[in-house]
């Protein structure tokens, strides 16, 4: 099965916080990892912000780059941009959330969508994705 990671899920891979083990488990089980092209910039900027200094930033970025090299990147082309508007309008999402979902929507099913953004979960479920998140129970109430 394919695992699609949004930025919130990718960040959990590098930070010791709730959700880290869930992400690690899915990445060990599934050989195909995908993410939108936007995720790279978002993750690197976020890792820069949380790093305690330049040494930790370099270590985090290095680990991320190793992972990024094995991630199948979904481009944010015209088709994806147009689909993100539809998804954003239908589910009242911010553009960044809609872009991640539109990128995932281009991939063959079945797929597991990893996110820790509670705004994305209802849309992901409606799009037919299996969702893995510690937020899933909250979103389904």
Model-based region annotation:
Residues 9-10, 39, 80, 100, ...:
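Alpha-helix capping/helix-boundary segments
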Residues 62, 69-91, 98-101:
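Acidic catalytic patch
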């Amino acid at each position: 099965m394919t695992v699609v990671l949004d930025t919130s899920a990718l960040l959990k891979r590098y930070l010791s916080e709730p959700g880290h083990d869930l992400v690690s488990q899915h990445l060990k089980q599934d050989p195909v990892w995908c993410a939108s092209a936007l995720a790279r910039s978002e993750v690197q900027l976020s890792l820069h912000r949380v790093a305690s200094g330049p040494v930790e930033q370099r270590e985090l970025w290095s680990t991320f780059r190793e992972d990024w090299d094995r991630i199948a990147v979904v481009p944010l082309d015209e088709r994806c941009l147009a689909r993100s508007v539809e998804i954003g309008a239908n589910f009242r999402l911010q553009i960044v959330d809609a872009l991640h979902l539109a990128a995932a929507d281009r991939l063959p099913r079945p797929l597991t969508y990893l996110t820790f953004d509670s705004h994305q979960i209802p849309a992901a479920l409606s799009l037919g994705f299996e969702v893995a998140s510690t937020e899933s129970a909250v979103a389904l109430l």
